[in-house]
From Swiss-Prot:
Intracellular or extracellular location(s): Secreted
Sulfotyrosine PTM positions: 3
The name this protein goes by in its record: Phyllocaerulein
Family designation: Belongs to the gastrin/cholecystokinin family.
Alphabetically ordered keywords of this record: Amidation, Amphibian defense peptide, Hypotensive agent, Pyrrolidone carboxylic acid, Secreted, Sulfation
Key word Secreted present: yes
Pyrrolidone carboxylic acid found at: 1
InterPro entries, A to Z: Gastrin/cholecystokinin_CS (IPR013152)
Coiled coil stretches, renumbered: none
Main location: secreted
CC terms in the record's Gene Ontology section: extracellular region
Its job: Hypotensive neuropeptide.
Modification Phenylalanine amide occurs at: 9
Amino acid sequence: QEYTGWMDF
């Protein structure tokens, strides 16, 4: 999972 700065669903 890449970090988007928000919750990864």
